[in-house]
């Protein structure tokens, strides 16, 4: 025994073994460390080498005293061989470590006495089995043996079979991307413990972690023995739509969604799965201590409340708990940015692409093309193209070829008979408006400025020319079809597509005849309530015209077949949308009927309490209904046939509203749990879904049906 103490005093050994003498006192931590604060150089080198390999800064360790380094910064502080040890004494017994990283030869050894401060219970995680070999019983008072290989790997992407062999091990809380456990056969929830205590000396090393969010790793790994289980009330509040997918709970820890074949065991480093919210973990990043989350997302720290979601909760939202439970449901528009803030009105000339000043002669044009068409169409001069009638007409070359410019005007639907349709944002009657403004209030004048000029048009009305001219073009979703289909990827692409289409819906609505004469609040409300129905109706038409209603043609780069319908977890909604698309073929809807029905769909959902100028809205809606009836009568001379056709089209319009409501419910539930299923919501989509959609779901906003439901 005397010989062992002499060996312990010898420096330069490489084994790094430290053993606690039997006579050491454990009553006082400070007195104990004060008497045994000498650390060998080899032990320091071992600690530094392991810290560097893990990406931890060594500079922060050098400023601490030897006792503080041993207490707070030794990476082997908890006992690695078993579950956390709970002892009445303030410190755990010494861990017995054998280091092979610095191997100067067998027989040499250095023994030092030290004491380690344990972390909070439930945070002990073991290093990867192939990186560190650990042995020891999990009982109190036992010592574990830690063996280091010649090369310490930073992280390892293992398979599920390899992870299953070590699934009973308590993992040590380090930023290593460890292979997670196999997905459970049944849904479960894992309790997230309190975050690490950053008041200790460990904070200095944690601040320099290469991933920058070491404080956020409290949710990684498997649940500790003391995690417990969620209550029945907590379990019942989970929506069944977002719980399981093919026997797997949202994918592996850190996976961020489903993965294709061959990727089941691949796990990326944790630092690359967090959203870019900052370089270091903040206090607000941690959830409440008793918040429960699905087991598959324990490696994802819940998002802090985003700025686009309100912070005031309505009484009917009390059943939604979690980070999004305090969502504010807007009752007034004081805190909502106007939709013009996101979508400034932009109109381009259909002839040359310059900024359009309004609808001239039945088409959106600039002032230059308006004057050119008037002179060219009324004049008797014949224009001939010097080339092949395919000249480029743009803002800078529109004067080069009058023949091609005039031809493009006719192709855009410009006619001399459309002069009565004035600027789109301001449908003013010159003489009638001036005379009525002096004798009646402004509101009465505005009500007379509806699309009354539309009445009396012939079988090819100018109204249809306007609808064809302002119809939005093709919008792509930006979906990467080379990646395997997953729930998160498909729904994120749909949300991005919805954001892009919403921009076109706003521009299209503002170009509709009579729309700008609505009260500005009514304009915003009508768009925000009807956008879902408009997109569903337009998507059904695209599916009918492009793929014969066999699939859902959301965008050229996002077409849903049967597999994607199931993968998106909205199969029932997709089936109803496909049936709507098939109705276009069964009823033989013409493009003119579709355009007028789509415009009428914009004016088919309003608040129960009414709009600011409800009377004018009703008059405008009635004019669009008359236009639909006039389009029907153009090709049918039999009144009975016209009535039957009007009945069919209005029934089709009514069928859009239940589909839109189902999608409203789906998107709202998805927004509530978006941070758990890795689905991205653009800012404007999140704003409308969180503020306006609840009004529809709660019954404060209802659609207008043609027929009794």
Swiss-Prot record:
Describe the processing and modification events after translation. Answer: Phosphorylated in prostate cancer cells in response to several growth factors including EGF. Phosphorylation is induced by c-Src kinase (CSK). Tyr-324 is one of the major phosphorylation sites and an increase in phosphorylation and Src kinase activity is associated with prostate cancer progression. Phosphorylation by TNK2 enhances the DNA-binding and transcriptional activity. Phosphorylation by CDK9 regulates AR promoter selectivity and cell growth. Sumoylated on Lys-191 (major) and Lys-310. Ubiquitinated. Deubiquitinated by USP26. 'Lys-6' and 'Lys-27'-linked polyubiquitination by RNF6 modulates AR transcriptional activity and specificity.
Where is the stretch described as Interaction with LPXN? 341-708
Keyword list, A-Z: Cytoplasm, DNA-binding, Isopeptide bond, Lipid-binding, Lipoprotein, Metal-binding, Nucleus, Palmitate, Phosphoprotein, Receptor, Steroid-binding, Transcription, Transcription regulation, Ubl conjugation, Zinc, Zinc-finger
Q: How does it assemble?
A: Binds DNA as a homodimer. Part of a ternary complex containing AR, EFCAB6/DJBP and PARK7. Interacts with HIPK3 and NR0B2 in the presence of androgen. The ligand binding domain interacts with KAT7/HBO1 in the presence of dihydrotestosterone. Interacts with EFCAB6/DJBP, PQBP1, RANBP9, RBAK, SPDEF, SRA1, TGFB1I1 and RREB1. Interacts with ZMIZ1/ZIMP10 and ZMIZ2/ZMIP7 which both enhance its transactivation activity. Interacts with SLC30A9 and RAD54L2/ARIP4. Interacts with MACROD1 (via macro domain).
Q: Where is the signal peptide?
A: none
Q: Which amino acids does the record list as binding 17beta-hydroxy-5alpha-androstan-3-one? A: 495, 542, 667
Q: Which parts of this chain are annotated as the region Modulating?
A: 1-347
Q: Mind telling me which residue stretches traverse the membrane in this protein? A: none
Name the gene that codes for it: AR
Bias class Low complexity marks the residues at: 12-28
Numbered residues of crosslink Glycyl lysine isopeptide (Lys-Gly) (interchain with G-Cter in SUMO):
191, 310
Record family assignment:
Belongs to the nuclear hormone receptor family. NR3 subfamily.
What are the DNA-binding region positions? 348-421
According to its UniProt entry, the protein's GO biological process terms are:
androgen receptor signaling pathway; intracellular receptor signaling pathway; negative regulation of extrinsic apoptotic signaling pathway; positive regulation of cell population proliferation; positive regulation of gene expression; positive regulation of transcription by RNA polymerase II; regulation of protein localization to plasma membrane
- Originating species: Oryctolagus cuniculus
The ranges of region (Interaction with ZNF318) come to 1-376
Look up keyword Transcription and say if it applies.
yes
The record, for InterPro entries, names: Andrgn_rcpt, NHR-like_dom_sf, Nucl_hrmn_rcpt_lig-bd, Nuclear_hormone_rcpt_NR3, Znf_hrmn_rcpt, Znf_NHR/GATA
Lineage top rank: taxon: Eukaryota
Notes on the domains: Composed of three domains: a modulating N-terminal domain, a DNA-binding domain and a C-terminal ligand-binding domain. In the presence of bound steroid the ligand-binding domain interacts with the N-terminal modulating domain, and thereby activates AR transcription factor activity. Agonist binding is required for dimerization and binding to target DNA. The transcription factor activity of the complex formed by ligand-activated AR and DNA is modulated by interactions with coactivator and corepressor proteins.
Positions of the region Disordered? 1-34
Domain (NR LBD): give its ranges: 458-689
Descriptive protein name = Androgen receptor
